[in-house]
From Swiss-Prot:
This is Photosystem II extrinsic protein V. One of the extrinsic, lumenal subunits of photosystem II (PSII). PSII is a light-driven water plastoquinone oxidoreductase, using light energy to abstract electrons from H(2)O, generating a proton gradient subsequently used for ATP formation. The extrinsic proteins stabilize the structure of photosystem II oxygen-evolving complex (OEC), the ion environment of oxygen evolution and protect the OEC against heat-induced inactivation. Low-potential cytochrome c that plays a role in the OEC of PSII. The gene is psbV. Gene3D superfamilies: Cytochrome c-like domain. PSII is composed of 1 copy each of membrane proteins PsbA, PsbB, PsbC, PsbD, PsbE, PsbF, PsbH, PsbI, PsbJ, PsbK, PsbL, PsbM, PsbT, PsbX, PsbY, PsbZ, Psb30/Ycf12, peripheral proteins PsbO, CyanoQ (PsbQ), PsbU, PsbV and a large number of cofactors. It forms dimeric complexes. It comes from Picosynechococcus sp. (strain ATCC 27264 / PCC 7002 / PR-6).
Length: 170
């Protein structure tokens, strides 16, 4: 008798509670919680002698900047224009000067040079010095550059060979 549209009120109530529980669970187990990293994973080189522990927020901000600004050419740590030089720790350590720390990477994002350090790449690689050419870098400040550099270093540590490893790994 109390059926509305052919559905028993008790079934409607149970369905409503189930939907609420599933929705509430999704909100609490979302992507933000999935990106929480251990402190050891967020510890990266600040310079050649010091390390720094990045906050989850710094890594998340760096990820957002990387996706919006860098991922077109550096998807999964690879380098579109030169697959032989990636954003892996091995390649960053092998650069001249080394780019395996936040401050060195920030320097590169301001004044990019070739892997051997000999050639100025300011007209070929996005940077903040030539923001007239590279509009994607125009609004990035020092903190943004540090966050995106930290994100790259964290990914290189956490993902290992999958970061910059190419199609055979990803």
């Amino acid at each position: 008798m109390n059926k509305i549209l052919g559905i028993d009120p008790l079934k409607k109530f149970i369905f409503g509670i189930s939907a609420f529980v599933l929705l509430f669970w999704q909100l609490n187990v979302g992507a933000a919680n999935a990106t929480a990293l251990r402190e050891v994973d967020r510890t990266v080189n600040l310079n050649e002698t010091e390390t720094v522990v990045l906050s989850d927020q710094q890594v998340a901000k760096g990820e957002r900047i990387f996706i919006n600004t860098c991922s077109t050419c550096h998807n999964s740590g690879r380098t579109k224009s030169n697959p032989n030089v990636t954003l892996s720790l091995v390649d960053l350590e092998g650069a001249e000067p080394r780019r395996d720390n936040i401050l060195a990477m920030v320097d590169y994002l301001k004044n990019p040079t070739s892997y051997d350090g000999e050639l100025d790449l300011s007209q070929l690689h996005p940077n903040t010095v030539r923001a007239d050419i590279w509009s994607s870098m125009r609004n990035l400040n020092e903190e943004d550059l540090q966050n995106v550099s930290g994100y790259v270093l964290v990914q290189a540590q956490v993902r290992g060979v999958a970061w910059g490893g190419g199609k055979t790994v990803n």
